[in-house]
Amino acid sequence: MKTCCFAGHRKITDDIEIIKIKLKKGIIDLIENHNVTTFYNGGKGDFDWLCAYTVDELKKDYPFISSHLVLSYMPTYKYANNLKSFDTTIYPEMEKTPPKFAIIKRNQWMIDNSKFLIAYVKQSLDSGAYKALSYAQKKNMTIINISI
């Protein structure tokens, strides 16, 4: 089982249709050419939800793939309506992590437990998405950055 995670800015500022095409192409390539079957998603912004819906849509053609929501905080009602896009939720051991750092820690967990990263990250040094991308680069992870 090979795993891919996603990291991206909360707001998509580029042409959404181009991002959708690149995202779907990247996911299909990982499934067909790299045997990726598991996808981790943080569920925290436009890009994460686009990834969730895309993986969910691709399950029709690839019923063996799975999608998992990796929580940075204990679940709230906000997630209840959106869980149908995921097979499971995962809450890594982060109870002692201050809330300010929970998303960073969650992103690191997803990267540490994945072989591939599909990113939508621009050069915004102070963003969590950029920090996740930098962390993945330091781990020599295979990265597909679909930002325009």
Describe each PLM feature range.
Residues M1-I148:
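Acidic/glycine-enriched connector segments
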